[in-house]
């Protein structure tokens, strides 16, 4: 009784959505992209194409890609700045990317450092947008959008944050490749400490009000 030894197709999802309750997800944006890739990198895979066609038939934009590492890093570079910094500032995307000082001191350096790590890991970053371009796009997309980043929503709801997935693993790769990441190290330490203190307060009954965190809406950050 199991799934067998079939190798799963890899999928990277770029979508703005909220977990209304366990098992129920609300899509909050008409722009939803699924990037599909075989572990082997075979962009001509019949099953990957069938999956893309099935998703497209359901109204979702789906693309078959040849290098999932490229897609994962592309998405990560969109999350590594505004997501953790939102926990420290309490601000939404529009407010943060519109703040010139914050962009120069934290947001842009985080993206540049992570991009340097990706390059050191063998990822072709030549076609990736620059840090400034990413932030400009984020600013444009955030206009009229009041949804806070997913890490901030998790923080406010008392749920575990994706600290390791978004920051910690990049830091581990940086150490392994010898790439300096001073901004990332500071932000990682601050966010981890904020999460720990927040959890301690909730355990002490100072911050949660007894509400079941699993029932609170959560936006799943999809690279924007």
Language model region names:
Residues 58, 84-88, 194:
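A short secondary-structure junction motif
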Residues 69-97, 102-115, 142:
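Active-site-proximal catalytic alpha-helix in oxidoreductases
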Residues 61-65, 88, 95-96, 127:
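Short, structured loop/turn "capping" segments at alpha-beta junctions
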Residues 18, 29, 72, 86, ...:
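Solvent-exposed, flexible loop/coil residues
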Residues 25-29, 80-82, 200-201:
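Short, hinge-like loop/turn segments at secondary-structure boundaries
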Residues 49, 96-97, 104-224:
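NAD(P)-dependent Rossmann-like dehydrogenase/reductase catalytic/cofactor-binding core
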Residues 23-38, 89-99, 147-156:
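Helix-loop-beta segment of a Rossmann-like dinucleotide-binding subdomain
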